[in-house]
């Protein structure tokens, strides 16, 4: 009987050992799988960190490039106007040099008037800069500054009778009001 018991115990122990071994193998397999998963996740984290740093550097480079482009835009925004101004200066220089040679002030006045008309024409067409403030215009306080007022009999509305300084508007915005003398009715 003892033999039978020992045999049964041995079988039980063997079965138990087999169960333990299987359980251990499962645990080992789970550990190996977990280690693989951890390694995969660590690699993925590393890749994502690398991608994040690259995108951050890319964005910083983009921001710097945009800032440089903005600075250049501001720096050279008036380049077209400056080219036109240089042409006007050339014409003025020619008029001055011509007047030194001939002393004909009527021709000098004509030349300077032509240059003024050229400047106003180009600025009007290209840049929408307009001059205003002429004798005979109705006085408009939003566009004209009355430096002096003269009372006369025959005026229905206040009217400009003398212009001290022309006014200018750019795209319908007043840059400078015209400084004028205004005539108005005594009544």
Swiss-Prot record:
A biological process (GO) annotation for this entry?
protein folding
* Start and end residues of each stretch annotated as Disordered: 1-30
For the keyword rRNA-binding, the answer is no
Q: Which UniProt keywords apply?
A: Chaperone, Cytoplasm, Stress response
Q: Quote the subcellular location field of this record.
A: Cytoplasm
Gene3D superfamilies given in the database record: 3.90.20.20, Head domain of nucleotide exchange factor GrpE
Tell me, what is one Gene Ontology molecular-function annotation carried by this entry?
protein-folding chaperone binding
Please give one Pfam family short name.
Answer: GrpE
Q: Signal sequence span per UniProt? A: none
- Highest taxon above the source species: Bacteria
Q: Which InterPro entries match?
A: GrpE (IPR000740), GrpE_coiled_coil (IPR013805), GrpE_head (IPR009012)
| Any one GO CC term of the record | cytoplasm
State if Protease is listed as a keyword. Answer: no
Q: What does this protein do?
A: Participates actively in the response to hyperosmotic and heat shock by preventing the aggregation of stress-denatured proteins, in association with DnaK and GrpE. It is the nucleotide exchange factor for DnaK and may function as a thermosensor. Unfolded proteins bind initially to DnaJ; upon interaction with the DnaJ-bound protein, DnaK hydrolyzes its bound ATP, resulting in the formation of a stable complex. GrpE releases ADP from DnaK; ATP binding to DnaK triggers the release of the substrate protein, thus completing the reaction cycle.
PANTHER family in the cross-refs? GRPE PROTEIN (PTHR21237), GRPE PROTEIN HOMOLOG, MITOCHONDRIAL (PTHR21237:SF23)
Record text on subunit structure and interactions: Homodimer.
Family the entry assigns: Belongs to the GrpE family.
Q: What is this protein called?
A: Protein GrpE
Name of encoding gene: grpE
């Amino acid at each position: 009987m003892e033999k039978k018991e020992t045999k049964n115990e041995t079988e039980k122990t063997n079965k138990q050992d087999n169960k333990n071994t299987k359980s251990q193998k499962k645990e080992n397999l789970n550990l190996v799988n977990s280690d693989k998963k951890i390694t995969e996740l660590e690699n993925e984290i590393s890749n994502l960190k690398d991608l994040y740093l690259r995108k951050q550097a890319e964005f910083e480079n983009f921001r710097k490039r945009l800032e440089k482009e903005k600075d250049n835009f501001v720096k050279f925004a008036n380049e077209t106007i400056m080219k036109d101004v240089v042409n006007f200066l050339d014409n003025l220089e020619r008029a001055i040099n011509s007047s030194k040679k001939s002393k004909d002030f009527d021709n000098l006045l004509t030349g300077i008037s032509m240059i003024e008309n050229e400047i106003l024409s180009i600025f009007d067409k290209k840049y929408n800069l307009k001059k205003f403030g002429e004798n005979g215009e109705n006085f408009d306080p939003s566009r004209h500054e009355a430096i002096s007022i003269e009372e006369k009999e025959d005026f229905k509305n206040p009217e400009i009778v003398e212009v001290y300084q022309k006014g200018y508007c750019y795209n319908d915005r007043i840059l400078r009001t015209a400084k004028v003398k205004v005539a108005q009715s005594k009544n």
